[in-house]
Amino acid sequence: MTGDRFGKLRPILVVGGGIGGLTAAIALRQRGFAVTVIEKDPAWSVYGVGIIQQANVLRAMGQLGILDRYVAAGAGFDVVEVFAPDGAQVARVAAPRLLEGYPANLGIGRRALQDVLGTSARAAGAEIRLGVTVSAYDECDHGLRVEFSDGSEGEFDILIGADGVYSQIRQAVFPDAPGPEFTGQAVWRYNFPGIAGHDALRAYNGAIGVGLVPITDDLMYLYATTPEPGNPHYPREGIAATMRGKLAGCAPAIRELAEQIVDDAGVVYRPLETIMLDGPWYKGRVVLLGDAAHATTPHLGQGAGMAIEDSLVLAEELAHHDTTEAAFAAYHRRRHARCKYIVEASLAICRGQLGRGPQIDNAKATAEMFAVTAQPI
């Protein structure tokens, strides 16, 4: 590419205002790129439950310059306690601290995380437009001409598809690529008052995998992965009772907690689907990141982490190269193997729980994941 430096005279367009899109906006603004983020949801809503963030995410937040505000919004912990299906503790896995003076891991509410990232992206100078999607785009030598769903148009140097597992951008760029695949499992989530002294992630093994994650000093959330043959639809009315029933065969401590699941509106249910693009994640001036390229199951708690790391690496490579082709190729080389490991290792746990593969030792898998993600990106 010749002429003006990309992202300087014309902005970079980020499609998707979730975790990956917002961290991309912050990272790009740090490098001096002009950024516009569009998000299809006019309310910019997120699930009201929590999310697990591992040590590599805390390191990334430090690189983004927002670590202290981020940590203050959640609950830190350094240990994963693993329990057998009957409730007996079988392992205690210490997570590595990658930053002195900060916890190894963090549980944080998704709304709190959205607030930290959205406020930080705007403060960094990113333009964020809500209730807008891409209607069409044309690519030429000097950039992209994009038409939006609100009738407006714009010129951009690069388009980043950070629009999730059902990515509109992926479908447009790679129409022949396989779509998301249902795993046979779903995840249920629900918030509870915190347990005194609960300063670890507690993970329960079994056909139904359950975890308890602190997200503030007085709040935690429960997640449960359940077999869901045929990918059924559950009506919202009565879904709290359905979730309670799913936990009826779990450890006594989980059954006792389940009695508090009474609010249908508080239940978050999501079928688990995965996708892993083994070919390039880019074509021309369009590039994918996060779930749009490599959606994983939550068994290792690294889906958001991989998207955040993608954002940092992509911004770095765009700053280091004079052409989009060179930058995108370098980004893909650095990210593909790491993201594929997370997708495959998480899916192996899922298949083991479903009886479709060998049972995976969760403590061993978690320790291995900590070691892999502690490595520089």
Give a label for each model feature.
Residues 235-268, 332, 337:
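Flavin-binding catalytic cores
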Residues 41, 50:
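Residues in the short beta-alpha loop(s) of Rossmann-like NAD(P)-binding domains
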Residues 190, 198-232, 236, 240, ...:
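Active-site substrate-recognition segment that forms the wall
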Residues 13-38, 160-161, 243, 266-352:
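Conserved mid-domain beta->alpha element of the FAD-binding
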Residues 20, 43, 166:
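Conserved Rossmann-like nucleotide-cofactor binding loop
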Residues 366-377:
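C-terminal auxiliary extensions adjacent to catalytic cores
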Residues 2-12, 54-174, 178-185, 189-191, ...:
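Conserved N-terminal helical subregion
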